[in-house]
Amino acid sequence: MATLVAPTTLDGLLGRVRALEPLIREHASRAERERRLAQPVSDALRDAGFFRIFRPASRGDGLELDPVTAFRVFEELSRIDSVVGWNVTLANACEVFGAWYSDHVTEEVFGSPKTVMAGSWNPPRKAVPADGGFRISGRTVFSSNCRSATWILGLANVFDDDKRCVSMTAERR
């Protein structure tokens, strides 16, 4: 399937959702059984742009949708299959954090239209300064869509001299 970037009107986006409905329904029981999106569905969602809903248009491939339009799309995907709606919504929630990335990290993470995010916020990991960066420790118990993701986003509490601040980390999968 070719990558689509237009149209980004609500009607156009809902048309894309409807076009994927037969494929999503065909693989719904498999997704439920395997507890993950079927690869053909994940690929079709990616190619249709549904993992780039909140990505900035300045990236060249981002849809940069407003929240009302985005959630209407999430709702329609969820109507077809809640597993699909959940995974697409959470993947896009991870993209929101890209607004705070440095230019270098933004280019590395979002430099490809095939980027798919997954993330886990709970429980947060612990990060302490180390040579060249941070040493992160902790355990992630759950992350929706991680098997389809090309990048994993995780929350880490940064500790330095008894002070704590919140930071996000991304890791290529």
Where are the regions that the model predicts?
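Basic/polar N-terminal segments that are highly enriched at the extreme N-terminus
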Residues: 1-15
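Conserved, charge-rich beta-strand/loop surface module that forms ligand/interface-binding patches
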Residues: 169-173
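Glycine-rich anion/phosphate-binding loop at the beta-strand->alpha-helix junction
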Residues: 155
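Glycine-rich flavin
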Residues: 39-47, 51-149, 160-167
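General structural feature for long, well-ordered alpha-helical segments within catalytic domains
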Residues: 13-16, 20, 37, 41, ...
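N-terminal capping segment at the start of a domain
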Residues: 20-28
